[in-house]
């Protein structure tokens, strides 16, 4: 690659590091082109998977202020730049790595913080953002119903007591 081409590639990688919410470094040694295409498909629109040169990646990461890849840039390396939900991308990578052991998840960056491969796997075990928000809303709604019941219970109990007294007086008369 000529120097102007390298400078353009570094600038592009730097911009991808800055604009993505997460980046996951993988080793793809032993994967075929068809398998790499299947990996890109499994990641969907939430991530862009690119095979990159280690030296260019190191320079771009340094320019973007990322030092998480120190010592990780060796061998055939590819990066998944996550633009959408990091959980969905982590699930896609984890599932593909289970089916294809040749894919090795090395490390990553999430919101500017370094994460290990085990943390990426733990991230994949989380439910999606929408599911977590729905569960939180459901729990909040349940607490509101419980509070409403607690506020109305004394009044309804008083009404039932008065009705029971009326019936008792009506039976006595």
Curated annotation (Swiss-Prot):
Keywords: Ribonucleoprotein, Ribosomal protein, RNA-binding, rRNA-binding. InterPro entries: Ribosomal_uL10, Ribosomal_uL10-like_sf, Ribosomal_uL10_bac, Ribosomal_uL10_bac_type, Ribosomal_uL10_CS_bac. One of its GO terms (biological process) is translation. It comes from the Bacteria. Pfam families: Ribosomal_L10. SUPFAM superfamilies: Ribosomal protein L10-like. One of its GO terms (molecular function) is structural constituent of ribosome. Part of the ribosomal stalk of the 50S ribosomal subunit. The N-terminus interacts with L11 and the large rRNA to form the base of the stalk. The C-terminus forms an elongated spine to which L12 dimers bind in a sequential fashion forming a multimeric L10(L12)X complex. Belongs to the universal ribosomal protein uL10 family. Forms part of the ribosomal stalk, playing a central role in the interaction of the ribosome with GTP-bound translation factors. This is Large ribosomal subunit protein uL10.
